[in-house]
Amino acid sequence: MIRARVIVASTRAAAGAYVDTSGPLLVAGLRDLGCEVDGPIVVEDGEPVAQALRAAVADGVDVVVTSGGTGLSPRDRTPEVTRGVLDYEIPGIAEAIRAYGREKVPTAALSRGLAGVAGRTLVVNLPGSPGGVRDGLAVLGPLLAHAVDQLRGGDHPRQ
């Protein structure tokens, strides 16, 4: 079974100013994909996101998906702190998520989310909107098991 963790990057939700809805949606979506899911863990954007990512990697989680903090606001720092945790990026995942979303909502192109690997953990940034989460899940669905298998040392299937 794939072990997943959901981290919500939202300074306002972490302060109790509003109730986040994208985190529970992401948890449910990952469970539908067959994952055992921790979270959602709601943290302020910025360094608390990096700390939560490092904790997930240290805990041996297979995949950690963040929601929020990927926009253009000066407060949106999730991609920057994620980059500092990653060993390497997987640009194709983030590109596919943006392309999928752009088909319905042109502003999906403004998401700065990243995807990559830290240790043996797949890390994916998603937007904080429910639509952005659904788009991310649609893209991750066919990729997740294969990506995790490779990170666990599996071979590429031969076709």
Task: Please name every model-derived segment.
Residues 1-159:
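Non-catalytic beta/alpha edge segments that cap or flank active sites
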